Structure formats: C-alpha cells, structure tokens
Amino acid sequence: MTRIIDSLAEIAQDYDVLFCDLWGCVHNGKVAYPAAIAALQDFRRGGGKVALMTNAPRPRRAVAAQIAALDVPEDAWDDIVTSGDAAQDAMFSGRVGRRVWHVGAEKDLSFFTDTPDPRAAAITRVAPAEAEGVVVTGLFDDMTETPADYHAALSEAAGRGLPLLCANPDIVVDFGEQRLYCAGALAQLYEQLGGEALYFGKPHAPIYDLARRRLGVSGGRELAIGDGIGTDIAGAVAQGIDSIFVTGGLAAEHMGGNVERPEDALLADWLKAEGLAPTYAIGRLR
C-alpha cells in the first residue's frame, strides 16, 4: 500500500541514489520549486547521489542551461540524464536509418548537433518523402498544435513502414498553467496508425542504465521520484526500485484539489484504476 509522506527527509536515510524527475517536481517550465531544491541539496549533503532524470528530448547540456536559467543550483544534483541522450545514441547507431524526417521545434535541433560523437555527421535531416525513418522530438508548435494536426503525415509514414524514434515518451507536460503535448503523444498516434515506435526515456530501461553509468553505481538502494504515473512510477516498477509519486503535478486534478497533500481515499482509488502502486506519495517534493 502506498504511504503518504510529508517530506523526503522522512525516508532519505533508506536510500543512496535518487532518480528525480525535473518537470513537475523541481520546476514547472517557468519557475523552480525552492522546497524541492532544498530537499535534493539535503539528500546530497547526507552522502546521497542525485541524477536528474528527464524525458526532455535535448542532450543534458541543453537541459543544464535551461534549469540554470530557472535558478536550479548545481549543488542540487550530481548529473543530468535525458531521454535525448539515450535516443541520440540510438539514432547515431542507425536505428532509424541515416536520412531522417525530423518532427519537432527548432529549439530541439541540439538533438542533432550537440554532441562530440563523430557518428552525428552521417545523419541527414530530409523531407518526409526522402526519409528512411522518423525522429520525433516534439510538435513543431506545442503551444497551438495537437496530435490531430499530424494524422495525415504520420499515416503516410506508417504506411511506408518507416520506423519512428521517439526522443521523449511523455504524452503531456504542464508548462505553467498550460498543458502541452509531447513527442510521446505523436508516437502513440503512430502506433495506432500501425507504425513502429522506438522509445528510450522513462519508463524504458536505457535511460536508467545510462544514469547508473554516469553516477558510477550499479543498483542498490535507489529511489525514483516523479509525477508521471506511466513514466516515472511505471519505470521504477519495471526497474524493481522504490518510488515517490508527486501527486501535485500531472495528477493534481484527481487528488482533491490540495496540491500539498493528496486525499488518502482519492489517491488509493486512482492508483487502483491506474494499476500501479508507488512506494510513497507526496503532494510536492520537499
């Protein structure tokens, strides 16, 4: 049964490593959460290691710059591991061919360029008709578009049998008060249209393996933290590690209106419907 806690400090002594989600836990895309930052700093001061693990489609250097601009200090984390990092390696390995149709915003171009990997030179972005595969980092304009805007183009690509690499398995994200679609929503549509989608972020294994390599750990007392039941919590369950579900993020509307602490009965009913049982739940990371 999921235990509701009031702070990370209540259980911190039981863990050596945190895999902590960023968006919805440490910031909301516009502002950082000071209490979450303080909790991570305290964990590290106690000797723990923190990997900020995000399904952002961009390499870690771009994400580091983003969170620095939001005033997330470097002493709150040991490393940043992104879905983009894991997916980038797969793309450079030729998993979806060398000539790819890129679906995503200009801000995501670092996915193709921000790397010392010499294999990057072999990847060429081309028009859909010339592509051997599809690389989705997001929507072209996530502020105004929905997956429905891509139905025709993705249907054609799926009909040609093009594999699709999804650089961000998230379906939606909250940007301030606005909910936006992510690359995962397009990959989901692609599969519904009969296409093949490849995933590398949470809840899939490659991003956890990469995080462990970067932290220099090989299992043990690990704890995952996140507000995505189908990504953060599902990933923790698949990895066989404990988790904290942050209920004041994506699932806040189902928890009784109090983002600081979920209502016990509502949480239990919702988790039962989702078919997942995180070890702990907390309103906001603190």
Region locations from a protein language model:
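Asp-based, Mg2+/Mn2+-dependent phosphohydrolase catalytic module
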Residues: 2-20, 27-46, 61-81, 85-286
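Canonical radical SAM enzyme core domain
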Residues: 56-60
